[in-house]
């Protein structure tokens, strides 16, 4: 087990117990690493050094300027989880599968390696919103699992090609043809 000792002064626990005042007085920075069984156990620190460190911590905790920014700028708005309607319902824009969707899909015989992406979910919701059909929440999840299984397997598991890329012909001549 590796460890990092944060002071050059090292002493055994027995020496510290025997005469702690002398050990701390000889410590270069007011701090001593105490070892027990050939491994660092804790640090012993003088009251003066502790006061210095606490003052430094307090100074660093204060802002460097008197300009304060509104905390709302840094916090993402928390959206309340949408309650799933009871019984059958038509697909709606904020519908989400359960948090353990991948596990449930496996129970239904659909092995999904990756969670549903935002694009896949948006496509699924848009399609079924237009259809206007009504199903239970579990049935919607089963439909999503099957849709993902079919959509991801349609290209042999490879990502879909970008239709905007220019293809590059190869320069290989198949056997039996002259070049």
UniProtKB/Swiss-Prot annotation:
InterPro entries: DnaT, DnaT_DNA_bind
Domain of life per record: Bacteria
Gene Ontology CC: primosome complex
Region: Disordered, residue numbers: 156-179
Keyword Oxidoreductase listed: no
GO BP annotation list: DNA replication, synthesis of primer
One Pfam short name: DnaT
UniProt keyword annotations, A-Z: DNA replication, DNA-binding, Primosome
Role this protein plays: Involved in the restart of stalled replication forks, which reloads the replicative helicase on sites other than the origin of replication. Can function in multiple replication restart pathways. Displaces ssDNA from a PriB-ssDNA complex. Probably forms a spiral filament on ssDNA.
HAMAP family assigned to the protein according to its UniProt record, in alphabetical order: DnaT (MF_01061)
Subunit structure: Homooligomerizes. Interacts with PriB. Component of the replication restart primosome. Primosome assembly occurs via a 'hand-off' mechanism. PriA binds to replication forks, subsequently PriB then DnaT bind; DnaT then displaces ssDNA to generate the helicase loading substrate.
Family statement drawn from the similarity comment of this UniProt entry: Belongs to the DnaT family.
Protein name as annotated: Replication restart protein DnaT
Lineage, highest ranks first: Bacteria, Pseudomonadati, Pseudomonadota, Gammaproteobacteria, Enterobacterales
